[in-house]
Regions:
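Active-site machinery of serine-nucleophile hydrolases
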Residues: 30, 34-93, 193-197
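A domain-start/cap signature at the N-terminus of enzymes
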Residues: 1-30, 104-128, 132-134, 167-170, ...
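Short, proline-enriched alpha-helix->beta-strand connector loops that line the catalytic pocket
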Residues: 143-149
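Alpha/beta-hydrolase fold nucleophile elbow
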Residues: 95-107
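Mature extracellular/periplasmic domains of secretome proteins
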Residues: 19, 49-57, 117, 140
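Short beta-strand/loop motif that positions the catalytic acidic residue
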Residues: 151-153
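Acidic catalytic loop of the alpha/beta-hydrolase fold
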Residues: 156-161
């Protein structure tokens, strides 16, 4: 299912997956899935919002996949406004637990979610970014506020390189701590061909 969402800059297709047993009086988590370069919101939806929908066996969340802006680089400055207006629409029309709003994405979608983590800490509880980078077409001013953040990088990714992912991590560690003191509290990375570390 999808809607044609009218916002201040036009119309954007937005895919919404509601729990089958949706109760208008029960607050639900809200999870945004952001498409990658060359991708589509329909692909995010078909792939279960990076697998998160498939593990939501108790139907605790509403999942949303907005289409990008239609260009090769699907998220830009205007899309931060799209996010704000779409979030306001969803909170006004569905029973959302506003303390549990999340965003995730892969590659360019991760870069957009990462950008949101810099200045939307007041509305986002956490982001999960797969193959992210600390850069984008446009990035917001950073707010020195904490947010939950998990990043996964690929050691052989030539576009969103491991170094870009590590830079994104270091920025969040700086924002998440007074005076940036957490910058050196990095999680240990797994060695190549070794088990993941959590």
């Amino acid at each position: 299912p999808y809607i044609d969402f009218r916002w201040s800059k036009g119309v954007r297709t937005v895919r919404i997956d509601m729990p089958k047993s949706y109760d208008k009086n029960k607050p639900y988590k809200l999870i945004f899935g952001m498409q990658c370069m060359g991708g589509a919101g329909s692909i995010v939806q078909d792939e279960g919002y990076h697998g998160l929908k498939w593990i939501d066996k108790n139907e605790t969340a509403i999942f949303v996949a907005p289409e990008g802006n239609g260009s090769q680089l699907p998220w830009g400055q205007d899309d931060y406004l799209l996010f704000d207006e779409l979030l306001a629409y969803l909170e006004g029309n569905f029973c959302i637990d506003s303390s549990r709003v999340f965003s995730t994405g892969f590659s360019y979608g991760a870069m957009f979610s990462n950008g949101l983590s810099w200045n939307h800490q007041d509305v986002l509880r956490a982001v999960a970014v797969y193959e992210t980078a600390e850069r984008n077409i446009w990035l917001p001013q950073r707010k020195k506020m904490g947010i939950g953040w998990i990043g996964v990088l690929g050691l052989d990714d030539g576009m969103c390189t491991p170094e870009m992912g590590r830079n994104a991590r270091d920025i969040i560690l700086t924002l998440n701590s007074g005076g940036g003191k957490a910058k050196n509290e990095r999680a240990e990375e797994a060695q190549r061909n070794a088990p993941h570390k959590c």
